[in-house]
């Protein structure tokens, strides 16, 4: 089997399960296979999720032991005790937000039920199983491949696709012929999702840091800009003829395309756009219905371009 074809998370899960079970077996613990199950459950998509799920597993297991011991001592080791246990335990883990520990705690309870007692040996056995499973899971899941190259690649490609869309829109305004934008739009949307997911995952792996990330802010900004750009492309498809004002609008969109990089200050282009809108509104009224529709579409495109630029400027200001 080609190891490169196996997902790193699958590989980590297999290693954690085997290692946890081997340690528990070497210690001659009862139900040593349970350590492997805990280790498997501890492998999460990010380090922060792993720590959170491990915490929930430990706390839910402690609650299960205490509640189980009380009920078994009062009612006895009978099926009705399990019924009462679940009626009490389920709402408790939900209220305490310990849902990830539910399966682990149920297995521990079945061990107590099978043994029909709770003594120091059983308590130590269950504690070691839990500690080994959680500990191995945490240790193995500390390895997370770097996402920096993926994020940088998606940022570069997104900038290129957005610039290409502005150039295509400019060409459509000047010629009245619409290129097929759907593939570029779909690809840009896919790149945005991949980049944003990668940035979120990297934030989840950053232990001890705040939940902020410049790359995540970039993808959020581009995501909002993309929706505006989609509207601009839609209006470009409504252009049925070439009008005189279109040349200046096309030149302006090319300027935006040439300066699409996120760190570029947008205020100068916002001022240029406002001047263009003023001249646009002051120009002579359209003569034909087709000319009116084209100028209306151009006006909407400029208004959406203004929102696009203001989103960019807000992003630049937040970085300062």
Summary of predicted features, one role per range:
Residues 1-183:
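A transmembrane helix-and-boundary motif of multi-pass membrane transporters/channels
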Residues 2-3, 209, 289:
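Short coil/turn segments at secondary-structure junctions
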Residues 41-42, 101-105, 109-111, 199, ...:
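Long, contiguous hydrophobic alpha-helical segments, chiefly transmembrane helices and signal peptides
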Residues 161, 165-169, 213-320:
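Soluble C-terminal extramembrane regulatory/interaction domains of multi-pass membrane proteins
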Residues 145-243:
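C-terminal membrane-adjacent module
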Residues 58-64, 77-79, 111, 129-133, ...:
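Short alpha-helical linear motifs
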